[in-house]
């Protein structure tokens, strides 16, 4: 990474605050309600390889977490994995610009974009009918099936401009030659969890 890859000082604090504000606003719009103060914002990203990237394990872990009786803090997991979609949800766009605009109740609430072939989507199928779909749950998943390149239509920020607002990232890969995403997370001072089945995780493990 270049020396100026990560914001420093006041610039970092401003970017983090802006990112958290955006992440919370989008989650609340999708869920149709306010979150508790200071939710734990968790993220994962990468190619849409449901098993190889460990998305199956991650979502199963979130289901178990949602089943805990005593969970003091709300958790929002952002799954930022590009997938076939037909653009940003118009109702979310309007609501984010003007909160008096209603959310379309006919839309699948946990995605920011119109998904193609929803009935076959592994993330959709993992959430539907699970504790993660319970409105009373304190654990929420928001699926962002778009490249984050400043023009996704919902955030209109880059991936790094959102990464900086997270409290934790999770990359439970089954296999990864190296894996840049945990390294990027650390670069932005966001704690990360990965596996020793990924090159970066194995390298860290051997240095301990």
Where do the protein language model's features map onto the residues?
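Catalytic cores of carbohydrate-active enzymes across secretory and cytosolic contexts
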Residues: 1-208
């Amino acid at each position: 990474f270049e020396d100026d890859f990560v914001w420093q000082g006041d610039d970092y604090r401003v970017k983090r605050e802006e990112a958290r504000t955006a992440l919370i606003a989008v989650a609340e719009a999708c869920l149709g309600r306010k979150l508790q103060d200071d939710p734990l914002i968790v993220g994962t990203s990468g190619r849409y390889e449901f098993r190889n990237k460990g998305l199956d394990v991650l979502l199963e872990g979130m289901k178990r977490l949602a089943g805990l009786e005593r969970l003091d803090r709300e958790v929002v997991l952002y799954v930022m994995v590009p997938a076939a979609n037909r653009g940003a949800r118009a109702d979310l766009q309007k609501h984010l610009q003007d909160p008096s605009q209603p959310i379309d109740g006919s839309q699948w609430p946990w995605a920011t974009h119109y998904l193609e072939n929803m009935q076959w989507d592994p993330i959709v199928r993992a959430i539907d009918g699970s504790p993660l779909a319970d409105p009373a749950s304190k654990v929420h998943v928001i699926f962002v099936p778009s490249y984050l390149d400043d023009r996704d239509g919902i955030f209109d920020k880059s991936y790094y401009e959102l990464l900086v607002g997270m409290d934790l990232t999770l990359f439970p890969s089954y296999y990864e030659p190296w894996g840049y995403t945990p390294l990027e997370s650390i670069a932005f001072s966001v704690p990360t969890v990965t596996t020793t089945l990924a090159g970066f995780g194995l390298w860290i493990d051997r240095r301990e």
